[in-house]
Amino acid sequence: MAQATDLLDRVTRFTSGFGVRGGYRAPTEAERSALLGGVTALFDGDVEKARTRLAEVDYRLDTFTDGPGGRRYAEVADAAARSGPADRGWGRVYVGLGAPVRWSVQVPHPIADQDTERLGVAVLRGAPGGVMVLAGAHRRAAGGPGGSDGDGEEGDGTGDGNAAGGGNAVGGGSGDKDGGGTGEADMAHRTDSVFHAVIAELTRRGLPGIQLHGFADSTVPGAGAVVSTGAGDAAAADAARLAAELASRGVRPCRAWSANCRMSGRGNAQGRLAAELGTRFLHLELARSVRADPGRRGEAARAIAAVTAGWAGE
């Protein structure tokens, strides 16, 4: 029987150890394949096969009931937890049980984009059939680039260029200090990670996703959010709905399809793949003042739930 616990507590205990001095190592192709094989088996409902494949790379699968939310989840996590530079930093995956997998919430920059991990939990709780893909390291771990915009947050940027630092980095940014990094642990701009591999599998299945980011209030003055469909437009109707829901809850959105918004994420690696495959993808940036206030963060989560509930078939 799944034990009762708190999803938010599990996530925040995990991310509380992140820092720019933390470790990250890109997985080998074999490691990535084994981990993805386990997660894919879990998506298909084969828990024992999932556990077997995950054990090949010292990952574990636990199930639990989220006390506050009441839903059951599976947690895919590193069983060989390490601290500091020795950490692999491959992240975690949380899968809602009791319903087919239908959509995802993606958190590529936990801690670096402050409270996006907390928002991710609230979003996952908001509708059945969800998957949360959570990065396992600070975006500047393992020697990633700096470039803070004032409160330690960089945003995802709008750049479409090729990044320096290797063929697995994309969306190099526009050169602005908030243009998004392409460091080894910047999951939004790399395609050789566990984070990208899991999202790529969901994207190939045609399942929609929303990726969460944060910006300093001074980066987009007057806006509490930037709503975008990234490099594609398959989620145009969803984006319009999300923007309207945010506005109705007092979070003023910049709509990237009708305005020249910074932080629109057109260089985002997962968004680019979604555009190639015609899968719905939403890129949401929230101002620090929205994320830092529990009430406003809750309103943002409820706005997102208006979209994810539709994805879940509710």
Please report, for each region that a protein language model flagged, where it lies by residue.
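N-terminal catalytic or cofactor-binding beta/alpha core of small enzyme domains
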Residues: 1-161, 165-313
